[in-house]
Amino acid sequence: MSGNTLGTLFTVTTFGESHGPAIGCVIDGCPPGMALTEADVQLELDRRKPGTSRHVTQRQEPDQVEILSGVFEGVTTGAPIALLIRNTDQRSKDYGNIVETFRPGHADYTYWQKYGVRDYRGGGRSSARLTAPVVGAGAIAKKWLRERFGVEVRGYMSALGEIEIPFVDWSHVRENPFFAPNADIVPQLEGYMDALRKDGDSIGARIDVVASGVPVGWGEPLFDRLDADIAHAMMGINAVKGVEIGAGFASVAQRGSVHGDELTPDGFVGNHAGGVLGGISTGQDITVSIAIKPTSSIRTPRRSITKAGEPAVIETFGRHDPCVGIRATPIAESMLALVLIDHALRHRAQCGDVSTATPKIAARAPQAQ
């Protein structure tokens, strides 16, 4: 199986399965000399881990990270960094009814047809459990970006099903299990999720991610454009079915006189481009939105087929998130950070000594605030 590595200079290769003994990743290309401890990584993993509220899977995984290599006396050495997270709460018996039957909406059918073998326990390699090592790697990328460039990568849930969540303040995000930027709407979200669970159904979500402080110049046209790599990484997250950069699909209804972000000596007048022009960062906030589909594992009986091609009706048991989007915010943040650190290193390698006489303008002109 190929396709398990993300990045060019800063690469992340994940390994493991949902019900195997452990999951993890190997990070190659991390610059040496950065202070790093397991506690730095654990902070991010704790934001993603399961069992933290009644609205997510009740699989109780501590997601305790172990750094096996690449760090000596608390400092990165430049050698590959191996992160290991042991699985401790597998319950494989919950999946006995799908050994011979494919779950609708899951990767069961496609993995079987492609590889001729399938780990049915929790989806095996296709499980969202594998986003944990991504978040671990993202913690390292975030730390380097913040310390080296002052870049901050933050995200929030902007919609849960048909409920739009107006942005109020970043401080609200860390105060509720939905990563909602509006504390007043949390009771409505909780009631919505309780009703879904009672119905044995699920729902999707939209997550917005913002990277602030990214300097102008990151991105490698034509085919390694910054926005192209962001979209590629975001689509690598389980259940993501859509990605927008900046105004995204709303650009269809915008006139050029509106969408084109004007430049003034004092800064950009708008940011419909989402901080990327021509595949290169503009120095503005990089804004990304992802659409996450409803969880496919639900208790509602649905039609399927067996390995023999016979019709079947399947009801999924086990401990599943009624909305995988609830825990997706730190995952999306990590994916964006991994793309940014990779492009920061690529830019430094080729264009680190390039300078022009044109001043770098502000991300947003004062009159546009």
UniProtKB/Swiss-Prot annotation:
Top-level taxon: Bacteria
Residues involved in NADP(+) binding: 48, 54
Cofactor mode of binding and number, as noted: Reduced FMN (FMNH(2)).
Keyword line: Amino-acid biosynthesis, Aromatic amino acid biosynthesis, FAD, Flavoprotein, FMN, Lyase, NADP
Database matches in InterPro entries: Chorismate_synth, Chorismate_synth_AroC_sf, Chorismate_synthase_CS
Reactions catalysed, as given in the entry: 5-O-(1-carboxyvinyl)-3-phosphoshikimate = chorismate + phosphate
Cofactors named for this entry: FMNH2
Family according to the record: Belongs to the chorismate synthase family.
Xref: PANTHER family: CHORISMATE SYNTHASE
Official protein name in the record: Chorismate synthase
UniProt source species: Burkholderia thailandensis (strain ATCC 700388 / DSM 13276 / CCUG 48851 / CIP 106301 / E264)
